[in-house]
């Protein structure tokens, strides 16, 4: 996919850069593989804001994605590549030889008419899903499981991938884009190739309204608030906050580590850069 630039006939078009979606399916998604979504506006069940700056946005249908690739040893053909408003990657509608349809994450270079399969010993080909023990070292992967049978969790967003760098003592060692090296059980599945839409990182929304369409509300600075609302609030005239940057709840920000799950830290061989 390429990037689209626009003639600056309006101010919002001057900086706008979008991903070219001319080769994607232009119709509606398959109805049997969609679900309705209700908006939360960033509120929890008590009505309190738990995710700031969320709200509004265009209506969406959730596309049910098969992250587990649970139909084993049944070949499928790629019917079409589609846009999915719920993720940055594109998705592929595949039709199995037994007639069932499914959505999967579309890797780069996957085309309409290609055949894919999930198997214990499939060919090392774009879109095929195999256990890590059956994949040669040096292969580029996406949608990698962390727990056997749970479904892919690693490398699912646009343009991402991991590299298989080693196997030892029942675990595969993978290198993530962040520079982290992590151990994953050899029986976990992964799909061959990199995720589609690598140009997502180069887009420019061009105007605030386009962010509102995506469900994002304005980000208000703490120094622009009152003291009751934020530790940086208040002061006579414009101030710089007067302290090291903190969250609205007083915790240090700007690089403070937030990872709590020590239980799985033993699987991280080398921390990210």
Swiss-Prot record:
Q: Which PROSITE patterns match?
A: RIBOSOMAL_L2
Q: Name one GO molecular function term.
A: rRNA binding
Give the Pfam families listed for this entry.
Ribosomal_L2, Ribosomal_L2_C
- This protein's source sits in the domain of life called Bacteria
Q: Where is the composition biased (Basic residues)?
A: 254-273
Q: Which UniProt keywords apply?
A: Ribonucleoprotein, Ribosomal protein, RNA-binding, rRNA-binding
A GO CC term attached to the entry = large ribosomal subunit
Instruction: Quote the function comment for this protein.
Output: One of the primary rRNA binding proteins. Required for association of the 30S and 50S subunits to form the 70S ribosome, for tRNA binding and peptide bond formation. It has been suggested to have peptidyltransferase activity; this is somewhat controversial. Makes several contacts with the 16S rRNA in the 70S ribosome.
Signal peptide range: none
Q: Which HAMAP family would you find in this protein's record? A: Ribosomal_uL2_B (MF_01320_B)
Positions of region (Disordered) = 228-273
Q: How does it assemble?
A: Part of the 50S ribosomal subunit. Forms a bridge to the 30S subunit in the 70S ribosome.
Looking up SMART domains in the UniProt record yields: Ribosomal_L2, Ribosomal_L2_C
Which family does the similarity line name? Answer: Belongs to the universal ribosomal protein uL2 family.
One Gene Ontology term from the biological process aspect of the record: translation
According to UniProt, the name of this protein is Large ribosomal subunit protein uL2
């Amino acid at each position: 996919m390429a990037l689209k630039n626009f003639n600056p006939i309006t101010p919002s078009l001057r900086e706008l850069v979008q991903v070219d979606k001319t080769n994607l399916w232009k119709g509606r998604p398959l109805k049997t593989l969609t679900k309705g979504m209700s908006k939360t506006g960033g509120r929890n069940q008590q009505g309190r804001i738990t995710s700031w700056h969320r709200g509004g946005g265009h209506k969406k249908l959730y596309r049910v994605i098969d992250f587990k690739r649970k139909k084993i040893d049944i070949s499928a053909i790629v019917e079409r590549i589609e846009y999915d408003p719920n993720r940055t990657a594109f998705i592929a509608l595949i039709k199995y030889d037994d007639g069932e349809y499914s959505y999967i994450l579309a890797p780069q270079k996957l085309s309409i008419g290609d055949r894919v399969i999930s198997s214990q010993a499939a060919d090392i080909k774009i879109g095929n899903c195999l256990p890590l023990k059956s994949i040669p070292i040096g292969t580029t992967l996406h949608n990698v499981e962390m727990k056997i049978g749970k479904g892919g969790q690693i490398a699912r967003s646009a343009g991402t991938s991991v590299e298989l760098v080693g196997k030892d003592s029942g675990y595969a060692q993978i290198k993530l884009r962040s520079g982290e090296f992590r151990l994953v059980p050899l029986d976990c599945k992964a799909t061959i190739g990199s995720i589609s839409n690598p140009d997502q990182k180069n887009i420019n929304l061009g105007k605030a309204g386009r962010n509102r369409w995506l469900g994002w509300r304005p980000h208000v600075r703490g120094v622009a608030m009152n003291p009751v609302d934020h530790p940086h609030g208040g002061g006579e005239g414009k101030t710089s906050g007067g302290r090291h940057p903190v969250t609205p709840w007083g915790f240090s920000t700007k690089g403070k580590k937030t990872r709590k799950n020590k239980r799985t830290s033993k699987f991280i061989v080398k921390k990210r850069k």
